[in-house]
Structure formats: C-alpha cells, structure tokens
C-alpha cells in the first residue's frame, strides 16, 4: 500500500464498501486507545475497501488535533495490510494543512478534507482552501461536499485541473441534480463517495451517478449485513436491496431521526447491543435512552 499512487488508492476505495469506525472513549471521555486498536483489528476481518479514521462517525468534531493524530496512528498500525487508512483534515485552512501533514507523517494513505469550521465561504474561497491542503501533502485528497462547503461542478473541475492529488469527491448534500452535474463534468477523473447519514438509504439512486461506494456507519455493528447489502447493490440484486431497506435500514433511520446528533450516537449504541461497547459519545452529543436502545436491539436481531 505504501507504493500505491493516490489515484490507485482512490480506485481501491471506489471498488468496495468503506468503513468509518467509531472512536472509543472511556467513562471519563478520554480516548480508549487499547479498545480502539482491538476494534480496528476486529473490523479488519470483514471485506471493506478503505478505513476512514476519526471521521464524522468517529466524532472528529469532538477530537483535538493531537487526538486525531493518535487515532490515525493507531488505525494505521492495526489495519490489515492492503487496507488504505484515510485521515481527516478540517477546520480553518492552516489547521487543515497541519492535520494533513500530521496524517502523512504517521502513515495514512489519504486525506478526507472536511468543511471549514463555522464560517461561510465563496466558491473561490473554497477552491483556495482545497488547493492549499492539496499542496501540503503528497497524499490523495478527497473533498467532502456538505454543510458550509458545497462545491459547484465548476469549482470541482478547477480543482481537478489544478491539483494532481485531488482524487475523490464525497457527497453529503443529497442534491441529485448537483451530483449529476459533477459526474457529467468530471466522469472517471475522480472517485465518488456517498456521504449522507446512513448512506445505504441513497445507495441505489446514487450508483447510477457514478457513486460506486459510500461510508457505511452501520458496518460498525452489523458488518456482514452491510457487506451483503453493498454486494447486492453492485450486482444489481435490487430485490435484496429493497427488502433490506424495509426490514432494517428505514426503521433504523426512523430511530436515528428521533433526536439531533443520533446519526453518531446510534452507532455507538449499536456497538453496545452487540457486546462491543465503544463508550459514551462526547458532548454535545447524547446517548440513546434505554427504550431506544431496546428498539435498536430488536432491529439488529432481524439482520444478525
């Protein structure tokens, strides 16, 4: 993996399902590195094509930059040979640059560039932001389009022309027209990743737009179901996909939608259900209550 080019790694990411592990915390909310390392090894038994350490599901927004480096280093050291580990970079441009360099120094294989913190920006500003991060690392960079960093097709095209190591586009918006425009403009120049919460909900229509993979949060606690769902999607077994949506994914999303922030909290709850607890979420997120946890356990039984 160390000798693979950024585009070769991006191609591997696009060929299978992507793992976005939670970050384990102790009861005092400090990073539980031993538990995290053990879990990365456990997830490595399954057939993911990439591992995104300390991403949104991993509570990136609640981690300090030194903690992000610690998490990424642990993931790199514990991931199976041949499994690319992608590290996050975010916040303001200077911080994102530092995080990208840090990730490269501890052996990450790529960068997921999250939106800048808090502030709104023009397309010119977003382009300048991405260019600086790309210039700071030899790793391949995937931009995450969501929230206050929604890229137009013109901006993505300019970045693809200007940054040889821009290799991926992750969509967290869900605008079918915009995704169509970007794919029509750039085609196979980039790897496209679905990045909406519970991405399985959007996987079927997005596949037609060149989005061949997505970040699967449920892979954390029902990895076999997540892989089976993905394989059915890619093989055109729509009957399996629709049945899986009705049996698990849609009811799961109904539970997830009960409270803001549950897109992450429910993943750690799922880990608790399968007796692989990852500790509490950090504030400002909140954990599921006992009734919600029991409801989730009933859903998991259906697909386990």
Swiss-Prot record:
**A Pfam family in this protein?**
DHDPS
Enzyme class, first EC level, given as a word: lyase
Its recorded reaction(s) are: 5-dehydro-4-deoxy-D-glucarate + H(+) = 2,5-dioxopentanoate + CO2 + H2O
* Alphabetical list of InterPro entries matching this protein: Aldolase_TIM, DapA-like, Dehydro-deoxyglucarate_dehyd
Example GO BP = D-glucarate catabolic process
So what EC number does this one have?
4.2.1.41
Keyword annotations from UniProtKB, A to Z: Lyase
Q: Which pathway does this chain act in? A: Carbohydrate acid metabolism; D-glucarate degradation; 2,5-dioxopentanoate from D-glucarate: step 2/2
Instruction: Identify a single GO molecular function assigned to this protein.
Output: 4-hydroxy-tetrahydrodipicolinate synthase activity
| CDD domains on file | KDGDH
Name the family the entry cites: Belongs to the DapA family.
Give the matching HAMAP family. Answer: KDGDH (MF_00694)
**What NCBIfam families does the annotation carry?**
KdgD (TIGR03249), PRK03620.1 (NF002958)
The name under which this protein is listed is Probable 5-dehydro-4-deoxyglucarate dehydratase
């Amino acid at each position: 993996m160390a000798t693979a080019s950024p585009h070769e790694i991006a191609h591997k990411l696009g060929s299978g399902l992507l793992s976005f592990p939670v970050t384990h915390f102790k009861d005092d909310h400090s990073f539980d590195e031993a538990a995290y390392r053990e879990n990365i090894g456990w997830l490595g038994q399954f057939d993911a094509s990439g591992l995104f350490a300390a991403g949104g599901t991993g509570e990136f927004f609640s981690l300090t930059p030194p903690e992000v480096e610690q998490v990424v280093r642990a993931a790199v050291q514990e991931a199976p040979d041949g499994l690319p580990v992608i590290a996050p970079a975010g916040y303001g441009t200077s911080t994102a640059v530092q995080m990208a360099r840090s990730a490269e120094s501890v052996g990450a294989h790529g960068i997921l560039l999250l939106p800048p913190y808090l502030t709104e920006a023009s397309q010119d500003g977003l382009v300048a932001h991405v260019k600086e991060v790309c210039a700071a690392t030899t790793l391949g960079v995937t931009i995450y389009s969501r929230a206050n960093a929604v890229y137009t097709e013109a901006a993505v095209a300019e970045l693809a022309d200007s940054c040889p190591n821009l290799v991926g586009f992750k969509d967290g918006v869900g605008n079918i027209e915009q995704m169509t425009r970007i794919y029509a403009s750039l085609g196979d120049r980039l790897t496209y990743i679905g990045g909406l919460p519970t991405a399985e909900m959007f996987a079927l229509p997005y596949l037609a737009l060149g989005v061949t993979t997505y970040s699967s949060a449920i892979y954390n606690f029902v990895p076999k179901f997540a892989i089976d769902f993905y394989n059915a999607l890619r093989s055109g077994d729509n009957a399996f996909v629709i049945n899986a949506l009705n049996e698990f994914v849609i009811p799961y999303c109904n539970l997830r939608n009960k409270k803001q922030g549950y897109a992450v909290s429910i993943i750690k709850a799922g880990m608790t259900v399968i007796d692989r607890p990852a500790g509490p979420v950090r504030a400002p997120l909140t954990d599921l209550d006992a009734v919600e946890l029991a409801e989730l356990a009933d859903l998991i039984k259906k697909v386990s």
